[in-house]
Swiss-Prot record:
BP GO terms, sorted: symbiont-mediated suppression of host cytoplasmic pattern recognition receptor signaling pathway via inhibition of RIG-I activity
Family listed: Belongs to the asfivirus I267L family.
Protein name: Protein I267L
Protein keywords: Early protein, Host-virus interaction, Inhibition of host innate immune response by virus, Inhibition of host RIG-I by virus, Inhibition of host RLR pathway by virus, Viral immunoevasion
Induction data: Expressed in the early phase of the viral replicative cycle.
Length: 267
């Protein structure tokens, strides 16, 4: 079984056209990180330049400045890297072109495998790879397994930083370098998940420990919906419980979640 982890970095912004408004990502870097169980990983790294027309840049000027400075450190007008892929001048055409390029590389990587698991952690990558309809492939979002953010993982696991690596285009150790991010997530996958029927699974926190955790959070957090004893608050209470588990990277399966809801009469 081939596992493929995909991360794309670039400039995300609003595009206005005859179809209305849509959020699109024009990549500057894409990483495809792939491996088979108990084998070493392989990395495909792609760089892009161009693809941001004047209107798209002007509309999203402040957002792009923030993304460049605080997230990925790419600039709109930097010199193309060697082997960097030139995107069309028109932003919408560039968006479609980069998706097509990533799709073509995925087909090459996966074509000889009968079972493929395409992994992503939120972001537009999930929409892209679902739309690709790669043969024999299942798409899975790591967020569904309560995978912590890379920022939280590197704070908890110092060895993740020391044994992971980024690329020269980023400040070394930057959490937003796609190679660094994929390497950290790969380590988390190896340590916390197992494969069952073609997808990743994670051991759920037992019911007793899950209840103790929620009781602890209720006592520790000042602003929570359990302060109001009203049926109208039930959905908010359910959402709050789920949020507590997700924010702390704790996976609880649906059966245990339902038992917790029953305990608090959240019908």
């Amino acid at each position: 079984m081939l596992l493929v982890l995909i991360d794309v970095d670039g400039f995300m912004g609003q595009l206005y056209n005859e179809n209305g408004t849509q959020m699109i990502l024009i990549p500057r870097e894409a990483v495809i990180f792939y491996w088979e169980k108990n084998t070493a990983f392989n990395i495909l790294q792609l760089f892009f330049h161009g693809g941001i027309d004047t209107i798209f840049e002007k509309t999203n000027q402040r957002s792009f400045a923030f993304q460049s400075r605080y997230i990925h450190h790419f600039t709109l007008d930097e010199s193309p890297l060697p082997n960097s892929i030139a995107l069309p001048t028109d932003t919408l055409q560039a968006f479609e072109a980069c998706k097509k390029i990533i799709f073509q590389h995925l087909v090459k990587i996966t074509k000889d495998h009968e079972q493929i698991l395409l992994l992503h952690k939120g972001g537009p990558e999930g929409e892209w790879i679902r739309s690709f309809n790669i043969p024999n492939a299942t798409v899975q979002n790591l967020n569904d397994l309560c995978c912590p953010s890379v920022e939280k993982l590197v704070l908890k696991k110092k060895d993740y930083v020391s044994s992971s690596f980024g690329c020269p285009k980023h400040i070394q150790g930057s959490n937003h370098c796609p190679i660094f991010e994929c390497h950290v997530l790969f380590k988390w996958i190896q340590e916390n998940t197992f494969i069952t029927q073609g997808v990743l699974e994670r051991s759920s926190l037992p019911y007793e420990k899950a209840v103790l955790f929620i009781e602890h959070r209720i006592n520790m957090v000042d602003n929570h919906p359990f302060k109001k004893d009203s049926i109208k608050q039930n959905q908010k209470k359910k959402n709050w419980i789920v949020t507590q588990f997700v924010q702390h990277g704790i996976y609880v399966d649906n059966g245990i979640l339902n038992k917790i809801y029953n305990k608090y009469s959240l019908f």
